[in-house]
Amino acid sequence: MEITLSKTLPSYPSFVEGIRRAPDRGYTLTPAQTATALKNALRYIPKELHETLAPEFMEELRTRGRIYGYRYRPQGDLKAKPIDEYKGNCIEGKAFQVMIDNNLCFDIALYPYELVTYGETGQVCQNWMQYRLIKQYLEVLTREQTLVIESGHPLGLFKSKPEAPRVIITNALMVGLYDNQKDWHTAMQMGVANYGQMTAGGGRYIGPQGIVHGTFNTLLNAGRLKLGIPQDGDLRGRLFVSSGLGGMSGAQPKAAEMAGAAAIIAEVDASRIETRHTQGWVGHVTDRKSARLSS
């Protein structure tokens, strides 16, 4: 069985105003590395479309520091649908489609158009060609097969058995000699390494609820260790000051509340503040213009 993208060129999608976009990651490749990066992206594309898409991919690489293949992103919001609305030969194949669409939903993903779910760089996969191919593989996956995905690249379906994993994923396994920031950045640009965080590339992101219990335990134990709080006590009467209201750090205000403390959490991105407030992780929002500190 051969899984390929269509020879029909998709229409270039429009971008919804107000949706967060990832910053330019920086283009630092040599000419030879650039050629390899283009080949790595074009390997997913039928040869008939290479001449059209090569300049487009080059422009993405030059201006965004990555080749995302925006043209292959489905139009609109990728909200997770009821599982029975997905094509598939097994429940696991359908379930994984639900999970990755949930990771890329406008209401959930940090930078939906760049496939970043959370953590500033945590991607589901590297580009939209990989997304489409992964979806196609999941639609035909059976309980006698396992899909292997390497840094977003769908390696293929392998003969397996029902009790084995339906999907095996690895992300960004760098050889020790090249496990440094410079070579990592090069590998990302060239399309051979994907930083999936924990649950972005793993397809199972659940937001701050995944870390709130650990944050609660950390705060409470810090109080016991540093403030002499008894084992059966909590942090009432204490003020917790921190920063960050992202996908993980957004658990801080709720964790502090659970531990009995008051909390002040600073965040420079207004959109992230709005998201956490709407979701209930933050109880009150103010800005520096309205905030007043008494002397």
Residue positions per predicted region:
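Hydrophobic, well-ordered beta-alpha structural blocks that scaffold small-molecule cofactor pockets
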Residues: 189-280
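Long, compositionally biased, glycine/small-hydrophobic-enriched stretches that function as flexible linkers
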Residues: 1-208
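Short coil/turn linker and secondary-structure boundary residues
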Residues: 29, 268, 286-288
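Short, hinge-like loop/turn segments at secondary-structure boundaries
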Residues: 281-285
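Hydrophobic, Leu/Ile/Phe/Ala-enriched alpha-helical segments that form helix-helix packing faces
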Residues: 134-141, 219-226, 295
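General structural feature for long, well-ordered alpha-helical segments within catalytic domains
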Residues: 53, 126, 130-137, 165, ...
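Conserved small/polar residues in nucleotide/adenosyl-binding loops
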Residues: 289-295
